[in-house]
């Protein structure tokens, strides 16, 4: 996985007793195969690789292909490696979608985040899942560019940080 998705969901599931994990790729190129192999526990049963891109005409997405190549000939050579897409079309990735990936760990190819009516690879989702700690306040701001949103948000953050204990 490249990006910030999955961390809260993985913590949530492991706290509930599930045996799941995530490897976050922080530097993609050059790809370090040995670092990946070292990060995977010997008890792994499935490896699902999430790519935030679609490569039409390719055998798979970039990270998926690199993971398959890295594991070839290693002690994980027999572990199934499955590839999925997420975040296509700038769609947000929700906790329920991440849980669907874990619940469908044996599915060879999949898509989350969009209704994939072309390849029909979308995973079925369960009920919405809330992984945010109680008492957390979330805000989402949209800007159109040059409309002052960035400056207004900086000021809001300063006000909240200076005048409340919510930081």
Predicted regions and their residues:
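Short, small-residue-biased leader/transition segments that mark boundaries at the very start
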Residues: 1-7
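Short acidic, glycine/serine/threonine-rich loops at helix termini
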Residues: 9-11, 33-35, 58-62, 92-97, ...
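Short helix-loop-beta junction
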Residues: 9-22, 73, 158-166
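Generic long, charged, amphipathic alpha-helical segments
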Residues: 12-40
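Solvent-exposed alpha-helices and their adjacent loops that cap or buttress functional pockets
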Residues: 39-42, 74-76, 130-136, 161
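Peripheral docking tails and interdomain loops at the edges
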Residues: 46, 50-132
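Conserved phosphate/anionic-ligand binding catalytic regions in large, soluble enzymes, centered on
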Residues: 138-159
């Amino acid at each position: 996985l490249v990006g910030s998705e999955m961390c809260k969901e993985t913590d949530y599931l492991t706290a509930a007793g599930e045996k799941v994990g995530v490897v976050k790729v922080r530097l993609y190129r050059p790809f370090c195969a040995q670092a990946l192999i070292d990060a995977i526990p010997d008890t792994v049963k499935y490896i699902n690789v999430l790519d935030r891109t679609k490569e039409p005409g390719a055998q798979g997405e970039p990270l998926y292909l690199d993971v398959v190549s890295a594991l070839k000939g290693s002690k994980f050579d027999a572990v199934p490696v499955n590839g999925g897409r997420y975040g296509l079309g700038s769609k947000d990735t929700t906790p329920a979608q991440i849980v669907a990936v874990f619940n469908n760990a044996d599915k060879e190819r999949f898509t989350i985040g969009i209704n994939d009516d072309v390849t029909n690879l979308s995973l079925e989702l369960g009920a919405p899942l809330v992984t945010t700690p109680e008492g957390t306040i979330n805000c989402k701001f949209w800007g159109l560019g040059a409309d002052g949103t960035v400056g207004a948000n900086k000021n809001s953050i300063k006000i909240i940080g200076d005048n409340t204990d919510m930081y």
